[in-house]
């Protein structure tokens, strides 16, 4: 069950190994060892000092023309809060790209019309961080949508929930050139206060999550 949910992250880790993700099973991190609030803020201030304008959001998409490349991307940028409040903002998140992974056709059609959004992410720096690189867990906050769809054309409150990578920490280099990246996944869709089972990954129908990777854009 768990392996199915993290298969995408395994694939992305192979495809983009150059991004230097660090395993969540890093030696010395027992799960009970945390940074002090002062240490946490110190790392967050150091991360916020960087510029992250040339970024990309990679996401799963069905590609019948090239089954070995089931990933697409959009340009993005990131700003990390300078207040040490564990938040960063990712721009141009492609909400419409989720449509192909939604089994409810009416909802999928409505999602396909949603414009890209800037979304806030919460993050927490991990104790295995160094003076060179901050390792962290990050996840977008829920996206709330008011959508009108269906044969009755009724308004529905739709909430998209995400989870962080179950395998790898995100990373942020603290010296130039700055490199930043983390993985996450769409995990649940709620409609009008009820959890649904509408997520059906178009690249793997047994997958009930949709994977994303946020990182520096490759130089052309």
Where are these regions (language model features)?
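First exposed extracellular module after export/assembly in secreted or surface-exposed proteins
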Residues: 34-220
